[in-house]
Amino acid sequence: SEVTAEQYQEFYQHLSGDHQEPLAWEHTAVDVPIQFYAVVYIPRQSPMELLFAPEPKVSINLHVKRVFIQDDCNDLLPLYLRFVRGVVDCDDLPLNVARESLQNNPVIAKIRQTLTRRILNKIEEMSNNEPEKYLTFWESFGIVLKEGVARDVENQEKVSQLLRFHSSFSAKLAVDAATDAAVSDAAATDAAATDAAVSDDAATEVDASADADASADADADTSAESKPSRTTQTEGLVSLQDYIDRAKSDQEVIYYVSGENRQQVEQSPLMEAFRKRDLEVLYLTDPVDEWVVNSLQKFDSKEFVAIDAEDLELPEEVKLEGVDEPIEDRERTIELVSYLKTELADRVGEVKESNRLTDSPCALVVPRGGVSQQMERLMRMSDESFPMTKRTLELNPKHPAIANMGEILKADRDSAELKDWAHFLVDYVLLAEGKVEEPQRVMSQVQRMMSMASEAALKARSA
């Protein structure tokens, strides 16, 4: 007889000890080329040990001809699917199979390959047809699933299609989704009010109409379920395919920015040029995100490019008018760049003009061959001797602060105020990134600059 949903859920609770309903399950029966049966579940919530266990393990129990052989059999699934719970029963293994021999057993390898493919298909089905449920899955297990991009070359493309990120378009997507939901709710309320106002004399007609509407709604629901929903609109999360579909016609790369949190990357000065040009940027805020895109390298033949790369090139057709125009006083900027290279030699690797900044005075970018701050932090967690990258300081020559520094330099190259401003350019960017080197020095510097600014304001008022 057919197994009911209640029976599947009861078995899951017995197997896992989890009293919540699972998000999904897959019942597999395979006869060729080997014979095995499996029931696997995707839980609703992540257990604590999933990320913090000293030795990660796969929670799949192995049976042979219905005889228990081993629990937590790591050979049955790749570790990035360790959130899956389940049981496998195989008829093509001997009852006396040794645990030590499972790793290189061709039967086990085939089971692993088949199960992995079916689980990924189940997750993909959820992402296409049940975006709300997929959001729950992603919040619980997304950080673990990402490991598959680097660790499972065979299924890398499949896993990459399941990745989700926030992006510079996320806020708009979330607003659009909320607006659609509000419109839908309002329409439903209006429809209910209209139905309530219909006279009893027309009840039969209303009932017939309601039946027809219900049938149409059911057809529409079926159609909606069969049509893949590529974006988890609820929280503005986007897939890589979403990004590709929205990209400019001549855009050949996927832009991303990495940082500790969404607020930090949104406030990055480097985002200015992309907002002006209406170019979408992925936000990589999980510690493993940059490792993931470096492993993936490309999606749909488009390379991943960090927006803090020094040699970044933007599409020609969307360059802003006036951004690359020569400034009025080239000599002033050249002199300032030369001065800053000397004054900040211990803090930055290079100083140059920027052709991407529009509102901010400066930004720090990663030189060719260097690693981002997020990746550097990750590397230094495992190796404290990992060398720190000296980033390049880019100046916006049209910003008043930079122009004024150039004028101060022309008047007095040895000005103490100019030296303070020079170092504050670097500190300004670090503050925006949530990192402060030598807080006491920065506090003293800010106090001096406050005094200078107030004195200048008084002089201007009395003049």
Regions found by a protein language model. Name each.
Residues S1-A463:
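Conserved GHKL (Bergerat-fold) ATPase module
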